């Protein structure tokens, strides 16, 4: 369990919901630097990194089998063009030569059993549902809520969020990150002209951003076990999450594109490792956005501190006897050396 301070439910303090104007006024009163510092503290003591790792793992379990199942189902349902667009897009997005992606997606073409493919898609939805449940757990800890909803309510809500917010978020992220690859795939499969590609290139950024923003605000509103403020208030934290996600994605893209040792190290697993890193960084961005939204609401309620005071043992109490003795001896030796060097330094004449 985390040690974050519970955020008061400001939605019940007045008759109406908090809006974007309230968020802006609170931010100006609070100060950007203090909000950033306290949000990072709330993220840390809410076990944000641990929940980010768990969420990234669940997202990968949903994306990989889901892509294989969709490519296979496109052949079974005689929608080969859509399957080709998906396959070409993923192969262009994958770093390296994309051989592992080609083989994985090719296995979907060889599977002609519709039942097996539908079961694979169902497995993807189960993994995405558990990812939404994991997001609820992480958001609760960051807000200072120590217990999640009962099992049936938690996973029923997570299933709905997976079908709504999860699918919309993945679509928005894919349109923004892979818009160029999607345009090339659509041109190759459906014969898009230059005008259509240019129009798609102009529309994909605002469209993808809007889809990702709507999905993120929906997650921030529906996931925590508390009465959340209005959507426009939560849009502040969602914007922080999307800005961080964009920066993380660009940094990862530059790293994989200009680091030749990355592909040489992982070989055919390069695409999988890139997906793991991207999922982890995306999860960090989401939970940091939750932390910013939570701390801003805490300030609205009276500048509640982000974490409880440390009641653990002091440094002297937790230090092992041998380690403490060795450390004290090293510190004493360093101090003697510094003092000796100070005495040997020639004095300056005025």
State each model region's role.
Residues 2-350:
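Membrane-embedded alpha-helices and immediately adjacent juxtamembrane helical segments
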